[in-house]
């Protein structure tokens, strides 16, 4: 009797249809609809209906469609649950993240995503096993044709309607843009992924082309105040976890006592490295919507006859295909601790100090710009402690390690300051982090990852300290990293025709926008994700 019930359950079309609907629902979530599934209910039903009809029609057609949806969804699943639909930020991370960073990403993923993945895999296997007992019925061709045509109409109605309404004869027709408007989410997801990927590759090609082109800078005058300028670009340091900005644990003792200028609120341009540094280190035009790929901090300093150096602990991925390394190779001299890419070792930022000493010791009559690009607090945090246990304690081991990495960066800045002092020449240092992070998980699984939704993903420390500073100055008005290129020129004493002559270090009140992987949005519209403290 039990075997008879089991056989009936396996062969029951209603059971199979329900399993396919659940599979469709989970696939939509994996592809990034997050909490927007209510608006995609028809799409969820449509995918379930398509798979059910395909199995009735042909086992081979079903397996092709089913396996394709599964592979697509499983491949995007972690990013889909964390970040939503495909964006330029997600695509950039795929291209510009090395192997160790990828491992760090998977280690930081919360347990809930692994549980979701387990049940999704389990459902996939169950459906594969059940469908083996199903028989195809090719005699119902009219019914199948009706279903396919209805689903095709559902998929194409909105794209066609949008194209009909298009009144711009100059607009180029693009297939990916056309299907992106589809109400059938798997189609719009795939189309958007292709479009965003092409956008990223176009940007990368423009950046590579810019290496051989003449910059558009038009320098009016150059009056350097210091002999040595050092720009330190940090990684993933949240402002509110530093004692510089009031965090109770002493994570940045050097920064909280050194004389200099501190922005009370400095807002990064983007929530992860590639989009943030593109909009920080390059000149932007058209209300920060476009980048001038030939015009960056290195090309500006070189035209102003500074001797330029780039010291990086971020490494190269492939043939100089990260945002930062493209700028770095334009310097007069560049040094990368990680010569390889995906299998590079985990090297401490202190490896940059000896090359720094060597550069400062030579050509002492030259005015120098030296950029240090740190690995800083990049995930996974504990990997940066060289096997030692964290000295700080905060809720989870990962968060404790994160605080330790902040202290490491603070100690490095203290050493940089001492090295510059020992040279006996005037100097000025700027430190900022490329972006912040947002919390993920809870309790002992608490960690942090990139997230575009929260203010703290953009709130980073910014401090300038120089050899002639005698006091600490707190700048109360907020400043945007979009304006950094203007402040960089001011810092180096460069006047240039494209750049604002307003005082970057004493900004007027302004509306600050950030790039959230899709568009520029008001920083104030973002959600809060306050720092954690020990109970």
Which positions does each model-derived feature cover?
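Metal-dependent active-site segment of extracytoplasmic phospho-/sulfohydrolases and closely related
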Residues: 230-231, 408-447, 489
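Histidine-centered active-site/metal-ligand motif
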Residues: 373, 378-379, 435, 446-449
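A long, amphipathic alpha-helix that forms part
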Residues: 47-48, 214-218, 354-361, 391-429
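Transmembrane and membrane-interface helices of multi-pass
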Residues: 2-179
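Active-site-proximal alpha/beta segments of enzymes that process anionic O-linked groups
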Residues: 158-232, 236-390, 459, 481-512, ...
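Membrane-interface soluble catalytic domains
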Residues: 4-21, 56-60, 299, 316-317, ...
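Active-site rim elements
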Residues: 33-34, 285-287, 397-406, 417-418, ...
């Amino acid at each position: 009797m039990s075997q008879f019930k089991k056989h009936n359950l396996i062969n029951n079309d209603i059971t199979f249809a329900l399993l396919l609907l659940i599979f469709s629902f989970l696939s939509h979530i994996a592809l990034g609809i997050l909490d927007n599934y209510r608006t995609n209910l028809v799409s969820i039903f449509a995918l379930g209906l398509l798979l059910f009809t395909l199995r009735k029609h042909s086992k081979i057609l079903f397996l092709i469609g089913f396996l394709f949806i599964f592979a697509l969804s499983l491949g995007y699943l972690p990013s889909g649950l964390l970040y939503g639909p495909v964006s330029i930020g997600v695509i950039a991370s795929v291209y510009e993240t090395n192997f160790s960073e990828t491992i760090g990403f998977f280690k930081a993923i919360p347990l809930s995503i692994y549980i979701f993945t387990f049940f999704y895999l389990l459902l996939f296997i169950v459906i594969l096993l059940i469908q083996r007992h199903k028989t195809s019925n090719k005699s119902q061709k009219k019914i199948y044709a009706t279903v396919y045509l209805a689903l095709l109409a559902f998929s194409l109605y909105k794209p066609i309607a949008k194209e009909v309404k298009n009144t711009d004869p100059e607009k180029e027709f693009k297939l990916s843009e056309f299907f992106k408007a589809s109400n059938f989410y798997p189609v719009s997801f795939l189309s958007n992924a292709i479009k965003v990927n092409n956008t990223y590759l176009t940007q990368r090609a423009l950046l590579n082309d810019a290496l051989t082109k003449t910059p558009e800078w038009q320098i009016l005058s150059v009056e350097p105040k210091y002999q040595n300028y050092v720009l330190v670009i940090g990684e993933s340091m949240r402002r509110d976890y530093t004692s510089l900005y009031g965090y109770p644990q002493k994570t940045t003792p050097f920064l909280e006592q050194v004389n200099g200028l501190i922005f009370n609120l400095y807002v990064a341009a983007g929530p992860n490295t590639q989009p943030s540094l593109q909009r920080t280190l390059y000149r932007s035009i058209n209300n920060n919507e476009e980048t001038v790929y030939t015009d960056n901090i290195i090309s500006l300093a070189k035209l102003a006859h500074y001797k330029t150096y780039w010291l990086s602990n971020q490494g190269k991925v492939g043939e100089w295909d990260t945002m930062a390394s493209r700028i770095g190779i334009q310097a007069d001299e560049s040094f990368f601790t990680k010569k390889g890419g995906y299998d590079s070792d985990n090297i401490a930022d202190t490896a940059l100090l000896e090359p720094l000493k060597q550069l400062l010791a030579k050509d002492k009559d030259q005015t120098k710009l030296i950029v240090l690009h740190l690995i800083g607090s990049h995930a996974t945090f504990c990997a940066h402690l060289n096997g030692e246990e964290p000295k700080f304690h905060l809720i989870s081991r990962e968060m404790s390690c994160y605080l330790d990495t902040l202290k490491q960066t603070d100690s490095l800045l203290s050493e940089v300051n001492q090295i510059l002092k020992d040279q006996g020449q005037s100097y000025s240092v700027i430190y900022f982090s490329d972006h912040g992070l947002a919390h993920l998980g809870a309790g002992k699984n608490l960690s942090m990852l990139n997230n575009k939704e929260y203010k703290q993903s953009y709130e980073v420390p910014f401090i300038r300290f120089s050899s002639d500073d005698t006091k600490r100055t707190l700048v109360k008005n907020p400043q945007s990293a979009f304006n950094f290129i203007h402040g960089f020129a001011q810092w180096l004493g460069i006047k240039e025709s494209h750049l604002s002559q307003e005082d970057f270090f004493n900004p007027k009140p302004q509306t600050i926008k950030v790039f959230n992987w899709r568009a520029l949005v008001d920083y104030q519209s973002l959600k809060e994700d306050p720092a954690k403290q020990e109970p």
